[in-house]
């Protein structure tokens, strides 16, 4: 297939090289799945730094359906329109059928999980909520996720979903299938299919709705507002603890030293981007080095847990997207870590859910601002406590009993957030800076 990918690639939401100079995007591997449908792996070559690899399923013919013509059309190949096949219902149904058949096409292996049924006749639609992958929902039954930027190794999203599903854990969407290839002697995960959580609500949306209701009734306490989230926070804590316990049972645990030096290095790097952190460095380093001679229990965990990675269904909470921290190599994302990292991620997310509204509502009324800040702090405290209560009830151990460890991981997360906000969203920088000051009190 002869088609130029550069212009199209750089316009995609999932393209990670926007801040780099792309020299070329060449076809490194192409697998013909059927006439007019190819799985293409692209080598993105840059003026400096390492190359990146991306996956595109390319269809050729009359083009994608009209509403997606701009985002999906790649160019002209051999006199025909080449386009992203995920925007073609017939092509996506065919991809699902390959998984259903556990087919092998050249060096691409499709695998259906045991004892599952795939909704081959369900209508597909592209799901537009992701930044790094592309997903297609089939009816209300399954969601097909295509990994866009691919790296060698075992993919934790497939690996951990498979472990949890086969163990019968109720707090994940069941894995239905996956597909992978081998390139230059190394395995590459290409995509997966899980049950679709129809009629679900994202935890972030639920939490921010609760804070909106609280701020609309600023003279009421959090427990007095109709949208109080504490009960859901408790049940979420139970769900996270259940997943942690299941992963520990299935994949084991080990003891490792607390990573004081690693956290200190991240702090030093963040100070370069956020000079406001400098005044806090001695106290933060003191917190880290206080734990330097201690060991902690580590296991496989989610690794990037926050309220945007959990869904509330009619049956309970689900944890989704076990990919780990974006941008890290797969081996790093698969490294065992303390469950406290996931707990800290949720607690930091509560902080954001409340305080982002203060940023958005900033005005000239100082009394009103102080009142809302007090309500936000109260909301965060109440929901953090409820989450930890639920976690402790399920796990039998309370993360607050390891207060120094929990605070260290909250600080590490807040330092990362500060660097991110300084680069991408400066108006939100006061959120992590305020959290750091509070954690050091």
Curated annotation (Swiss-Prot):
GO biological process: carbohydrate phosphorylation; glycogen biosynthetic process; trehalose biosynthetic process
GO MF entries: ATP binding; kinase activity
Superkingdom, taxonomy of origin: Bacteria
Disruption phenotype: Cells lacking this gene display maltose accumulation.
Keywords: ATP-binding, Carbohydrate metabolism, Glycogen biosynthesis, Glycogen metabolism, Kinase, Nucleotide-binding, Transferase
EC number of the protein: 2.7.1.175
Protein family: Belongs to the aminoglycoside phosphotransferase family.
Record's protein name: Maltokinase
Organism: Mycolicibacterium smegmatis (strain ATCC 700084 / mc(2)155)
Top-level taxonomy: Bacteria, Bacillati, Actinomycetota, Actinomycetes, Mycobacteriales
């Amino acid at each position: 297939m002869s088609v130029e990918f550069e212009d199209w690639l750089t316009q995609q939401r999932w393209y990670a090289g926007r801040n780099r100079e792309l020299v070329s995007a060449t076809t490194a591997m192409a697998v013909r799945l059927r006439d007019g449908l190819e799985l293409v792996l692209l080598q993105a070559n840059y003026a400096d730094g390492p190359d990146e690899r991306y996956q595109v399923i390319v269809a050729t013919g009359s083009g994608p359906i009209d509403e997606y013509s701009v985002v999906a059309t790649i160019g002209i190949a051999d006199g025909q329109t080449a386009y992203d096949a995920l925007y073609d219902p017939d092509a996506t149904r065919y991809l699902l059928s390959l998984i259903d058949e556990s087919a092998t096409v050249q060096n691409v292996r499709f695998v259906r999980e045991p004892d599952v049924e795939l909704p081959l006749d369900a209508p597909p639609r592209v799901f537009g909520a992701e930044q790094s992958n592309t997903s297609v929902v089939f009816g209300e039954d399954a969601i097909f996720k295509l990994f866009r930027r691919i790296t060698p190794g075992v993919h934790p999203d497939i690996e951990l979903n498979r472990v949890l599903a086969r163990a019968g854990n109720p707090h994940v969407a069941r894995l239905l299938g996956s597909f992978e290839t081998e390139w230059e002697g190394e395995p590459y995960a290409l995509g997966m299919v899980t049950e679709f959580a129809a009629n679900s609500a994202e935890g972030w949306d639920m939490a921010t709705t609760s804070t909106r209701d609280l701020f609309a009734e600023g003279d009421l306490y959090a427990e007095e507002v109709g949208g109080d989230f504490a009960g859901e926070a408790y049940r979420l804590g139970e769900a996270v603890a259940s997943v942690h316990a299941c992963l520990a049972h299935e994949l084991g645990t080990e003891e490792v030293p607390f990573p004081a030096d690693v956290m200190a290095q991240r702090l030093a790097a963040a100070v370069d981007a956020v000079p406001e952190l400098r005044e806090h460095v001695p106290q933060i380093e003191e917190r880290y080095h206080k734990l330097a001679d201690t060991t902690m229990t580590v296991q496989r965990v989610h690794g990037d847990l926050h309220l945007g990675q959990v869904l509330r269904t009619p049956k309970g909470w689900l944890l989704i997207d076990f990919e780990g921290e974006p941008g890290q190599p797969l081996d790093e994302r698969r490294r065992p870590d303390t469950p406290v990292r996931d707990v800290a991620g949720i607690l930091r997310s509560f902080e954001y859910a409340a305080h982002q509204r203060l940023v958005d509502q900033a005005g000239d009324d100082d009394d009103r601002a102080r009142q809302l800040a007090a309500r936000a702090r109260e909301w965060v405290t109440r929901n953090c406590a409820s989450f930890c209560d639920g976690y402790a009830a399920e796990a039998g151990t309370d993360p607050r009993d390891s207060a120094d460890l929990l605070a260290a991981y909250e600080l590490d997360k807040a330092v990362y957030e500060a660097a991110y906000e300084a680069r991408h969203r400066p108006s939100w920088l006061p959120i992590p800076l305020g959290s750091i000051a509070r954690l050091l009190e």
